[in-house]
């Protein structure tokens, strides 16, 4: 059964006119007003940033913000009409709720959910779960697909490669988990994006062989909120 882990504030609907300079998106609201919204996603948004598609934005009451609106969702129609999460600030918040509510039985028993714990080569792990054998959890957001196959990454990521090396190295003293946040509900499996970054895919496979745990988590995204659906199969 889907489990609601995040509820959006009231959102406004519109259509995407353009995205530019990575951080900006011009959107025509249903009211007819054209606004410039903050785009909280610095990546290429491969296959997702489709001009003219329906979007939802949130509005901040903070008078100090340069842009009052934040682009939250876009609808794509690759498989069927599907809402895709745009705000990359949300996945870690949702995963924190997922971990605190013990939604992943495969992780077993653990104590405290710690955030941004230093480890590796001047890095910070997204989450550290305390226990006799601590669990280090790194979260990666993905919206790129090929059919119903979710893929990560969609571009070369030296930072992501570094994280995989560090997670593999820490297996000597702890469990290590790579959690992929599939930020759309139309995918049924996950695979590394070898065509975008073959080195990342190689490092992921090396890590798995050494004991790295990989959990591609499926989520249903809607203008109402984000629901956890379960763990998708991994294709290597």
Curated annotation (Swiss-Prot):
One of its GO terms (molecular function) is DNA binding. Pfam families: SfsA (PF03749), SfsA_N (PF17746). InterPro entries: SfsA, SfsA_C, SfsA_N. Belongs to the SfsA family. PANTHER family: SUGAR FERMENTATION STIMULATION PROTEIN A (PTHR30545:SF2). This is Sugar fermentation stimulation protein homolog. It comes from Synechococcus elongatus (strain ATCC 33912 / PCC 7942 / FACHB-805).
